[in-house]
Amino acid sequence: MSSLPRAQVMTPSAPPVPQRRVLAARLEPFDSYWQAPKDIDAGFRSFTAYYKANYLGRLPAARDTSILVVSCGPGYLVHMLREQGYHNVLGIDSDPEKVAHARRHNLPCETAHAFEFLEGREGAYDVIIPEQELNHLTLDETIEFLRLCRRALRPGGQVIVYAMNGANPFVGSENLSHNIDHFYNVTEYSLQQILELSGFTRIQVFPLKLYVFWKNPLNYVGLAVTTVLELLLRGVFVLYGKKVRVLSKKIAASAVVP
């Protein structure tokens, strides 16, 4: 007498563990802000002045605006936003030591990797600002990141990004080649292209001001020299048939979700 085949017992499989997105940068990852003085606490004053001069006037006036700061580092930009009355702010950074420093200053920051954090947060924010340069991503990674930002923003939401300016003939090439984790430069035209490819509209490109420390006399010297040089360079570009408006060391843009 033959025995009946035994029924197979199906055990439910465990849900797959999400894999962290491995980015191309090896030493200075995009989702962790590395640029800080040796005395990290001293940076709060200087970076507050820098961010106020470059970003504050481009943000929505409503202080309940939901703002995400990606690659927040020790919390410089988050600190400025909180100081200016924005109370619905969150910073994320992939380096727990930097986040720990921000939290010692009672800043709302947490450890997270940017790509994974943005996935599944559709329509969660009004403004997203990466504190790290876009060029710590490859071009494909940049567009992927910006599309994640677009999905995480509400309709009419805003992203503010920046990168190294390849149009500056003095520092453009050096900026690109001195760091193996710098993958490209942009100009005002190519930065606009990147944002358009990522689905953003109402793109406004602007220079990032370096000389914003008015108590330092050298600030005025630097501002005067760079102003004259940039004026002369615009004339040279015209002779080559190029209309270049932004020649600052770093170039930024604000863009909106349609």
Report the location of each language-model feature.
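Short, glycine-/aromatic-enriched active-site segment of Class I SAM-dependent methyltransferases
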Residues: V161-H182
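Short, hinge-like loop/turn segments at secondary-structure boundaries
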Residues: L107-E110, S177-I180, V221-L223
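Conserved N-terminal segment of class I S-adenosyl-L-methionine
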Residues: M1-G123, V127-E131, D140-R147, S248-I251, ...
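A short His-aromatic
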Residues: N135-L137
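Short glycine-dipeptide loop
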Residues: L153-V159
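Short alpha-helix
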Residues: F183-S198
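A C-terminal cap/extension of S-adenosyl-L-methionine-dependent methyltransferases
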Residues: Q193, Q204-P258
